Amino acid sequence: FTDYMGNCGTGNSVGVGGAGVTGTIGYAFDSGFSLAGGISSPQGAIMTEESADIFALEAAYTADTYGVALAYASNDGAAGDETTYWGLNASYTPENTSFPSISAGYETQDDGTDASGYFVGLTWSEVGPGSVSVGAGTTGNFTDDQTETLIYEAAYSYPVNDGMTITPGVFITEVDGGDDLTGILVKTSFS
């Protein structure tokens, strides 16, 4: 439901682009390896002195029961203040569906100070007609001297028919120095 949980805690390194001009290229090898790269800018131009360009690369390997991806992104910023990100995502799905699949992500950020964030999630793929997912992670990347806040999420997703899935869920976001934010929602997806 929430963006940070949806991108496995590595949205700055893996989820780059889409806000303005973006160009990407990728290739999936037969062996399960894939490589991708791209450039993006929230302004109307890329690779100019005025544009805040973001360059990114990703290498991934996917097998039948697991996958891992390593991503690098460099955001040169409109003022020339460069920020670099490294992200590592991994997932494992056991063959026995009684056990949950696990997904995890870890991201570092360097803009002159080091910050990091993480995510971990579990999904039981066969619970009644649907699946149950739970997850927890930081609400962003934090330096060592910042107060780290977390977000928690739980959802049940089930198909209504061949073209529609309903997903009710709940999330709790910790707020430093304030009341936590709690949300209950229902998402409908069409395919």
Protein language model annotation of sequence segments:
Residues 1-58:
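Surface-exposed coil loops of outer-membrane beta-barrel proteins
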Residues 1-14, 21, 123, 129-131, ...:
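Outer-membrane beta-barrel biogenesis signature
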Residues 32, 49-151:
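Detector for outer-membrane/organellar transmembrane beta-barrel domains
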Residues 140, 175, 183:
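Conserved structured catalytic cores and adjacent interaction surfaces
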Residues 153, 164-167:
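C-terminal transmembrane helix-loop-helix hairpin of multi-pass membrane proteins
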Residues 158, 180-191:
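Outer-membrane beta-barrel "beta-signal"
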Residues 170-176:
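A short, acidic, flexible beta-alpha connecting loop/helix-capping segment that sits on the rim
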